[in-house]
């Protein structure tokens, strides 16, 4: 009996064990994709989290315009800005605004959606909606520049900080323009599971989302598989997928931080469909610490949305993550007091949260940790945001390099200024002081006095122990003087130092490209050096670097080096009998670049692969074919397709289509007249990319008719097409062959059509460039735009106006070698040899070893002496 019982128990255990094992072993197929289920499904099990989420900034990120959601006063209110009086009113249940439209005239528009809840609320108008669009699709939404200040309860006009004049309807910055389009610029971060769905052919949006605001699945990922597992009878989560949501709480902080970075970063998209927990670098390219967006020491200047700052911080490198300070569901900080910091910095009593450390009276603003270590900058007129680089105040860097510091910022109200400057700065914040100080010597002197006062007190309190060498010095020096060799050497050291934050190292790599002497040295090595000396410091670092942001920076400078080598074939007279560049002499130096780029095309991060593929296109096709085997060329085609997909994911932007055309154009094999020299397969491939490039430029003109670039590029390609027609016409025997005569006549008709189009393209481009140049001059930025306008004027025969515009460009960017070169050449054209000689000398200061610049300078000297 006992034996039977034992056998029965054993059998039951075996069956039970088998069931348990089977239950554990079963898994969701790897190919199965989770779907979005919505917050109502999540609430069933996660009510506590839902309660915290309700009413949060994520919950209020976007909504329909209703009596419950609209905070502004639409009771027949008016607001005037730059000569335009707008009126806010109701039409039954609809919220309406009468304001300037894309044609420059006043129109009534319905406000359909609201954006945000505090400290401001914005409002959106829908354009281009057709009657046949499904209810769940949204057409083009434009964000009004008229906003509601929720604290002061008033309307205000939101103006870009660097634009002082009225924004015209043709400007992309106008509220009806591209930069204020919700579908392109806002939607991805204000809604869940956004599908942009832009129809390039019809120029229409069919945008959808699963939830209108930033809901649960925006961070945790689509939840259908999680729900399936939670509601199943299984005793286990999935052995491969766990609980089938993004793993945001693991020991590695990367997944959580990069999930937040998707929206809290200054970045560009390279593909759609990011889900929480995925790699940021497979979907986005993060902006480095550029001169336009960050101060030289890495403090925030423009709107950069946290991530780039946090990557610089010691907190990030010590494993701190977003939810250590912020509640992930309410989005609020966990404490409004210094406990937010001291809950981790639990040092002996009296070390930090005491006057012995902060040197301020108890209860004053200066006693708060965040005031010194996370100073605020106000954006969008009323929205103060804290710098997340969490740094020690460094007034010594302010004294040396003009960077901000928390001490001067807090004590700016103690400044002593004459009445004129006081009036100029009324209502301005610290960032405005720093900007105005560059133009106003009185303001600059007062800021320097305050910085020196702050530095004196910091040294008195804490000594100089914390004032260690900082990358601000290096960035400031190379940006002030591109020929500073010592700064260049320090940049090299910085890139190789793994103790330096990766975003700083990546920025250093980009800054190396400023150093004109280093670029010239690359050229000299390519044409004059021995093989063992051919590898540049950038290339050496690129061969061993693993961090995506550092690689991106290195690739930018590597592209400059490759392009400089290729372009220098003309300067060194490396041409063949047809007058085309002969690249045989640069095969060896380019070999190192090609091998490195091919390796990077297998990188795990998409952003690295496509950037390597893009830079690879700078290598001439003939050199590519010589250095790569068929397998490597095939691999490049795969990654090239990834690159094209990435660019096309932003096809609603004229700049993306302009880039697409340039990418296709780089794949055109040879100059078109020498078509007989190319085999049929290569000719067809070249023709395909030639046609694709022209179509991309045409699309760019359709999408962004008020933006420059595409017309000029298309006109240049038309010139190539005309060369092809001329070449084909020369081969025809018109006198003796009737068919040839017919072909000739057909080509003449084609020529006429292309010539007429090209003339119009250049005329329109000149007008658009003129508008852009005027905006750039008014904003005191954009010397490159003014330079391009000047070149277009020259092509149009307006030499005097070209000289005038180049003189302006020189004022905006006195150390830009290309602008200095153009100005020198136009002065020579105008026979102003003495002035031209001065700028030729300036050019040789910037690029000392360039043989063509030396020859130009000598020629100018001869003409002056005649």
Task: Please name every model-derived segment.
Residues 22-26, 48-116, 120-129, 143-145, ...:
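Primarily the internal scaffold of c-type cytochrome electron-transfer domains
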Residues 499-501, 531, 545-547, 604-605, ...:
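Short inter-helical turns and helix N-cap capping residues of alpha-solenoid HEAT/ARM repeat scaffolds
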Residues 560, 618, 666, 720-723, ...:
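Register position in tetratricopeptide repeats
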Residues 484-495, 517-542, 564-600, 622-644, ...:
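Amphipathic alpha-helical scaffolding segments comprising HEAT/armadillo-like alpha-solenoid repeats
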């Amino acid at each position: 009996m006992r034996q039977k019982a034992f056998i029965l128990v054993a059998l039951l255990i075996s069956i039970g064990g088998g069931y348990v094992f089977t239950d554990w072993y079963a898994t969701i197929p790897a190919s199965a994709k989770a779907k979005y289920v919505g917050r109502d499904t999540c609430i069933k099990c996660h009510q506590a989290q839902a309660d915290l989420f309700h009413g949060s900034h994520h919950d209020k990120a976007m909504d329909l315009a209703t009596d419950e959601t609209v905070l502004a006063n639409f009771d027949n209110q008016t607001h005037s800005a730059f000569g335009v009086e707008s009126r806010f009113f109701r039409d039954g249940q609809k919220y309406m605004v009468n304001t300037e439209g894309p044609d420059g005239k006043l129109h009534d528009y319905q406000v359909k959606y609201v954006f945000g809840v505090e400290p401001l609320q914005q409002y959106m108008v829908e354009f281009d909606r057709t009657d046949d669009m499904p209810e769940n699709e949204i057409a083009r939404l434009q964000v009004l520049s008229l906003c509601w200040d929720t604290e002061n309860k008033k309307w205000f006009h939101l103006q870009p900080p660097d634009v002082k004049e009225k924004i015209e309807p043709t400007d992309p910055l106008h509220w009806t323009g591209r930069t204020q389009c919700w579908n392109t610029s806002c939607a991805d971060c204000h809604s869940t599971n956004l599908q942009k769905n832009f129809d390039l052919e019809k120029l229409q949006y069919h945008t959808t989302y699963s939830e209108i605001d930033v809901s649960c699945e925006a961070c945790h990922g689509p939840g259908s598989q999680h729900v399936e597992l939670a509601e199943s009878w299984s005793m286990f989560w999935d052995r491969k997928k766990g609980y089938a949501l993004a793993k945001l709480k693991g020991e590695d902080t990367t997944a959580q931080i990069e999930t937040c970075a998707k929206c809290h970063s200054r970045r560009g998209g390279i593909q759609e469909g990011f889900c929480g927990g995925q790699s940021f670098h497979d979907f986005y390219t993060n902006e480095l610490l550029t001169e336009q967006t960050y101060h030289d020491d890495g403090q925030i200047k423009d709107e950069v949305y946290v991530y780039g700052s946090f990557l610089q911080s010691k907190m990030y490198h010590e494993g701190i993550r977003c939810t250590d300070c912020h509640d992930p569901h309410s989005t609020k900080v966990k404490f409004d007091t210094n406990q937010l910091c001291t809950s981790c910095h639990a040092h002996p009593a009296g070390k930090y949260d005491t006057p012995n450390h902060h040197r301020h009276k108890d209860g004053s603003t200066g006693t708060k940790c965040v005031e010194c270590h996370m100073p605020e900058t106000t954006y969008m007129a009323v929205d103060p945001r804290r710098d997340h680089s969490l740094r020690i105040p460094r007034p010594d860097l302010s004294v040396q390099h003009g960077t901000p510091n928390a001490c001067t910022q807090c004590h700016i109200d103690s400044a002593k200024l004459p009445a004129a400057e006081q009036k100029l700065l009324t209502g301005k914040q610290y960032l405005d002081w720093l900007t105005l100080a560059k133009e106003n010597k009185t303001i600059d002197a007062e800021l320097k006095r305050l910085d020196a006062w702050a530095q004196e007190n910091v040294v008195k309190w804490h000594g100089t122990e914390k004032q260690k060498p900082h990358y601000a010095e290096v960035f400031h020096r190379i940006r002030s003087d591109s020929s500073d060799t010592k700064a260049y050497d320090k940049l090299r050291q910085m890139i190789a130092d793994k103790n330096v934050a990766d975003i700083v190292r990546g920025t250093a790599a980009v800054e190396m490209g400023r150093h004109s002497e280093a670029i010239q040295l690359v050229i000299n090595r390519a044409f004059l050096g021995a093989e063992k000396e051919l590898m540049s410091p950038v290339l050496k670092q690129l061969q061993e670097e693993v961090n995506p942001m550092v690689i991106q920076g290195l690739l930018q400078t590597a592209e400059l080096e490759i392009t400089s080598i290729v372009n220098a074939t003309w300067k060194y007279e490396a041409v063949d009998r047809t007058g085309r560049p002969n690249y045989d002499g640069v095969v060896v130096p380019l070999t190192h670049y090609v091998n490195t780029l091919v390796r990077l095309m297998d990188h795990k991060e998409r952003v690295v692969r496509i950037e390597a593929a893009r830079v690879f296109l700078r290598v001439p096709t003939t050199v590519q074919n010589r250095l790569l085997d068929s397998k490597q060329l095939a691999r490049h085609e795969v990654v090239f397709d990834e690159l094209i997909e990435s660019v096309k994911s932003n096809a609603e932007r004229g700049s993306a289509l302009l880039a697409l055309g340039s990418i296709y154009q780089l794949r055109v094999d040879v100059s078109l007249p020498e078509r007989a020299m190319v085999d049929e397969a290569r000719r067809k491939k070249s023709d395909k990319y030639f046609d694709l490039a022209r179509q991309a430029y045409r699309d760019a003109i359709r999408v962004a008719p008020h933006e420059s670039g595409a017309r000029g590029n298309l006109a240049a390609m038309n010139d190539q097409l005309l060369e092809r027609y001329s070449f084909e016409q020369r081969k025809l025997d018109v006198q003796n062959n009737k068919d040839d005569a017919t072909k000739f006549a057909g080509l003449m008709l084609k020529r006429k059509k292309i010539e007429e189009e090209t003339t119009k393209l250049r005329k329109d481009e000149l007008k658009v460039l003129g508008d852009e140049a005027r905006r750039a001059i008014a904003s005191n930025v954009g010397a490159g735009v003014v330079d391009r306008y000047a070149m277009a004027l020259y092509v149009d025969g307006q030499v005097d106006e070209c000289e005038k515009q180049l003189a302006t460009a020189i004022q905006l960017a006195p150390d830009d070698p290309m602008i200095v070169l153009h100005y020198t050449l136009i002065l020579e054209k105008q026979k102003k040899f003495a002035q031209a000689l001065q700028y030729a000398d300036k050019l040789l200061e910037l690029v000392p070893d360039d043989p063509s610049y030396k020859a130009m300078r000598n020629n100018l000297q001869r003409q002056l002496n005649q």
